[in-house]
Amino acid sequence: MNKREIARYIDQTNLKPYATKEDIIKLCDEAIEYGFYAVCVNPYRVKLAKDYLREKNADVKVASVIGFPLGATPTEVKVFEAKRALEDGADELDMVINIGALKDKDYEYVKNDIAEVVKVAHERGAKVKVIIETCYLTEEEKVKACELAKEAGADFVKTSTGFGTGGATVEDVRLMRKVVGPEMGVKAAGGIRTYEQALEMIEAGANRIGTSSGVKIVEGAPDE
């Protein structure tokens, strides 16, 4: 997989709480230069990223995060956050599942929590990725989380926030792909810093990579 091809898998990410305006502009410039699929930024920075990319006439989507990084806010709060991010120009929303509710086996709540965000996103033509935060889940819970995300109409399942105790693993990506089937997206995120790691995730079934190391990944890829 060459530089140009792997770049289209990448959501170049800066979710640091202390990211400045300058940092976000740099992120957008990298996305333009390397041809990344999207930039992923905190909700407060969506408008800045969208306006800048639009001004540059760039073919780069803007993703943002909802209920991040804990997933423990009430559904109404996630919906409000989603609406605001969409108004500011987000094309994709990476929302965190309610992990505690999943562990309580309150599956109706978990599914509805996702479905409500999906509803507002799809009304505006935006996609939703559901972060299941694999590092906190048993195998059984990972399977259930993927099933609920699929039933709720989400577009992707995603491994990790990058703020938990662990990131993406090849095993988790493979399992998630097996559960959701070919028609849904799988995003691997958390700890992916090299071309080799990214390629492993893609071979395991990921069709999106979330990373703050997109430049390093592309530079490690063959030219052709």
UniProtKB/Swiss-Prot annotation:
Alphabetical list of CDD domains matching this protein: DeoC
Alphabetically ordered keywords of this record: Cytoplasm, Lyase, Schiff base
Any one biological process term the GO annotation gives: 2-deoxyribose 1-phosphate catabolic process
InterPro entries xref list: Aldolase_TIM, DeoC, DeoC/FbaB/LacD_aldolase, DeoC_typeI
Thermal behavior of activity: Optimum temperature is 95 degrees Celsius.
Catalysed reactions listed for this entry: 2-deoxy-D-ribose 5-phosphate = D-glyceraldehyde 3-phosphate + acetaldehyde
PANTHER family: DEOXYRIBOSE-PHOSPHATE ALDOLASE
Complex and partners: Homodimer.
Family under the similarity heading: Belongs to the DeoC/FbaB aldolase family. DeoC type 1 subfamily.
Its biological purpose: Catalyzes a reversible aldol reaction between acetaldehyde and D-glyceraldehyde 3-phosphate to generate 2-deoxy-D-ribose 5-phosphate. Could be involved in pentose biosynthesis.
Designated name of the protein: Deoxyribose-phosphate aldolase
Organism: Thermococcus kodakarensis (strain ATCC BAA-918 / JCM 12380 / KOD1) (Pyrococcus kodakaraensis (strain KOD1))
